[in-house]
């Protein structure tokens, strides 16, 4: 009997494989993206200290509106870039979380780039 492929399990394996070579430092922290069916979350993480430096999500009161999911991802990208700039962070390492660079993940990344983050 053929079993159905669990997309999230494959994504988690891909993310673990990529994370072996990808880490953030204090000078160049990691921008991590998590995508659920309804919301999108972004964190800027210093892996040396194990500390989250900034975060934004589509659940935040200033972002949450009745917009499409791609539009919300764009707003989250702009918000995380603004919070990073407030903390003095200009360069980051982009961690797409095992997701394809398409749709909401791409919209978040491009909005963060346009708002001043370099990666």
Swiss-Prot record:
Pfam families for this protein: Ribosomal_L18p
SUPFAM superfamilies found in the cross-reference section: Translational machinery components
Keywords carried by this UniProt record: Ribonucleoprotein, Ribosomal protein, RNA-binding, rRNA-binding
Record carries keyword Ribosomal protein: yes
Entries under InterPro entries matching the protein: Ribosomal_uL18_bac-type (IPR004389), Ribosomal_uL18_bac/euk (IPR005484)
Keyword match DNA-binding: no
Gene Ontology molecular functions: 5S rRNA binding; structural constituent of ribosome
GO cellular component: cytosolic large ribosomal subunit
Single GO BP term: translation
Highest taxon in the source lineage: Bacteria
Described purpose of this protein according to its UniProt entry: This is one of the proteins that bind and probably mediate the attachment of the 5S RNA into the large ribosomal subunit, where it forms part of the central protuberance.
PANTHER family named among the record's database cross-references: 39S RIBOSOMAL PROTEIN L18, MITOCHONDRIAL, LARGE RIBOSOMAL SUBUNIT PROTEIN UL18M
Name of this chain's protein: Large ribosomal subunit protein uL18
Organism, scientific name: Staphylococcus aureus (strain NCTC 8325 / PS 47)
Lineage: Bacteria, Bacillati, Bacillota, Bacilli, Bacillales
Gene name per UniProt: rplR
């Amino acid at each position: 009997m053929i079993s159905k492929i669990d997309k999230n399990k494959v994504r988690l394996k891909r993310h673990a494989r990529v994370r072996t070579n990808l880490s953030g430092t204090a000078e160049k922290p990691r921008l991590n993206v998590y995508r659920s069916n309804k919301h999108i979350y972004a964190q800027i993480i210093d892996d040396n200290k194990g500390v989250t430096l900034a975060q934004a999500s589509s659940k935040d009161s200033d972002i949450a509106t009745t917009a499409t999911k791609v539009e919300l991802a764009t707003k989250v990208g702009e918000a995380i870039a603004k919070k990073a700039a407030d903390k003095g962070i200009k360069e980051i390492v982009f961690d797409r979380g095992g997701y394809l660079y398409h749709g909401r993940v791409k919209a978040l990344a491009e909005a963060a780039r346009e708002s001043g983050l370099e990666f």
